[in-house]
Amino acid sequence: MSDREMSEDEGLEEEKAPSLTASATPLALAPADLLRTAADPALTEDFALALLKRADLSVEVIEQLAKNTNALKSRKMKIALASHPKTPRHVSVPLARQFYTFDLMKVALSPTVPADVKVAVDHVLISRLKTVTVGERLMLARRASGRVAAALLLDVETIGTKITDAKTVARETRVTQAALENRRLTEALVINSVLRPAATAALVHAVAQHPKWSCRREIRAALLRTEHLSLARALEFSHEIPTPLLHELLTNSRLPPQIKDQLLRESQASSPPAGC
């Protein structure tokens, strides 16, 4: 066969197999064609984003998209890939480590992202809290997941163990209050936060005075186990707890001994006499 004939044959083959990205729409592609399309170096951002709107993509197709370096030049593409419900953790989490703060928040809040991936993405975000600005901390406290809000309750800006100045106190108070107002924050997360050794007096006082959280019985019981609750609040919260249960609770409490003793005296004095 001559060189000319070979060249003509190759041209015919190319005509028979044009790039799928040029001849089809993402939703029209048959499952058998998806893998070849995902690997196509000519894959455009718009086509790839439209492709990721398909819920029927296989893990193999998603992994192939993750290997398509041309497609992954796009920030939108990376976010869409990490947010797809079929994207495996070993693909989405490394991608998430490349994201900006609010891109991480967006992925973690996406309803399509699997729960275990959301947790992993939240952990990436939490690991960066020391490096974000005050404005970003406030925004995260208001809008991020409950896990991030709970982390912000504990992640106060300090030097050593002492808050540096009045401005820092005011900033961190705003962050704490914003986190406590976060609609995704749960009772369990608040309890876990106040019981952590890292919980500050400011956090305990903020929760103890909060109009929503301070009314919860389980949170009151948790606050009675902390070392920072004021005597006035401790007396108020202990009044609704039966004496035997209060004894048990205070056994594991870090409250100062003098406050524990007064709570027990008040509880015994208000208890009805035996046999009544």
Provide a role label for each language-model segment:
Residues 2-276:
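Alpha-helical scaffold segments
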